[in-house]
Amino acid sequence: MIKVLIADDQELIRESLKIVLGTHEDIDVVGTAADGVEVLKCLELKQVDVILMDIRMPKLDGVMATKEVKAKYPDTKIIILTTFDDDDFVFSALRYGASGYLLKGVSMDELYKAIVTVN
């Protein structure tokens, strides 16, 4: 079972991803977070294999959250979800240890395959 945390400041995106990913028997969405601070709090309480991380979030953005997650939990994989594919924020997150990125709007099949692949 792959334990997934969804981090996005838009509730609709968080809940939609949770519902869709919940249809896969090998994925367990163990939590959602609205910002990077909530991501770090979740990781203190739960074991997470893969984080789906938005880049632009309040309080602690996806870049700095990626840096902190990889420093404290180096085995946790991070897939960046973004609306921009040439964004400097994305490249910064990749430098800090994100496993890859996907554009928002990607098919759910591609998202599922990415989660399985990085895990």
Write out the residue ranges for each language-model feature:
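Short amphipathic alpha-helix used as the core "switch/output" element in two-component signaling
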Residues: 41-42, 63-75
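C-terminal output helix
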Residues: 88, 106-119
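Two-component/phosphorelay signaling modules centered on CheY-like receiver
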Residues: 11-31
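Active-site beta3 strand of CheY-like receiver
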Residues: 46-52
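Active-site residues of response regulator receiver
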Residues: 8, 54, 82
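The feature encodes the CheY-like receiver
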Residues: 13, 53, 58
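Acidic catalytic/metal-coordinating carboxylates
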Residues: 35-38, 59-64
